Design a protein with these regions (language model features):
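Serine-esterase "nucleophile elbow" of acetyl-processing enzymes
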Residues: 1-67
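Alpha-helical cap/lid subdomain in secreted, periplasmic
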Residues: 2-5, 35-36, 52-242
Length: 242
């Protein structure tokens, strides 16, 4: 029996990709695909924006992975929704420009350019998940604007676009008989979620149900159902060459 070739997959992003305060779909992918030679390296860092991924990209390039999966931008969006959050974010994360779709486009384009120039990796860009579950509120309208940027970059650069938002949107429309709970900003719901999970050992699914969400836990992070959409899209992308 021949030895299976190892496929190294680097995952870039923030807390949703990191999977510590959100359902761990990278761990799920390891369980699904590890036996087939896929090795996942999670370089995501909670709080990162696209700019932070860009300036720390050399660590990924040094690995020379076979695949790179990028899911980053939710923090860019939440900062763009609030001048106060934007100011704090720029100060704490050393973001050099105001938050905008143009700044996001510049950073994401440079990430893809640098990866294409310095590696042979196949690149998958994951569309940003829903932000709150009322699809017609400003947060989700903004998410769709940022996802349009991602889709355009993917088309221009001939890399793969993984339509997670689109799948989640379709699921919510099919399974909700009224508008879902909206994302209101602020940190209270997220802090309570963290206390419930890490102090009282409640699962993300239990917290999600108590908070009245279908795919999310606190309006941003994912329960297991929400995370499965991402895992499924990534697995589909990774298995295309098999």
């Amino acid at each position: 029996m021949g030895i299976k070739k190892e496929h190294v997959v680097v995952c870039l992003g923030a807390s949703i990709m990191r999977g510590q305060v959100s359902s761990n779909f990278v761990g799920d992918l390891e369980a699904r695909m590890g036996k087939d030679g896929f090795r996942f390296i999670n370089h995501a860092v909670a709080g990162y924006e696209a700019y932070n991924v860009l300036v720390n990209l050399d660590a990924t390039i040094d690995i020379q992975p076979d695949y790179v999966i990028i899911l980053v931008g939710t923090n860019d969006v939440t900062a763009s929704l609030s001048p106060g959050v934007s100011r704090i974010s720029r100060l704490m994360k050393k973001i050099p420009e105001p938050h905008s779709t143009a700044f996001y486009r510049k950073n994401m384009s440079q990430i893809v350019h640098k990866l294409k120039k310095s590696t042979m990796a196949r690149i998958g860009i994951v569309s940003l998940p829903v932000l709150g579950e009322d699809l017609e509120t400003t947060p989700n309208l903004r998410i769709r604007e940022y996802n349009a940027v991602l889709k355009d970059i993917a088309n221009r650069e001939q890399v793969s676009y993984l339509p997670v938002y689109e799948q989640q949107e379709a699921y919510l429309k099919q399974n909700q008989d009224h508008a879902g709970r909206e994302y209101r900003g602020g940190v209270k719901t997220s802090l309570v979620m963290l206390i419930r999970h890490f102090l009282f050992r409640q699962s993300f699914d239990t917290i999600s149900k108590k908070n009245g969400y279908t795919l999310l836990t606190d309006g941003i992070h994912l329960n297991s159902r929400g995370a499965k959409f991402i895992a499924d899209e990534i697995e589909l992308f990774l298995r295309e060459d098999e």
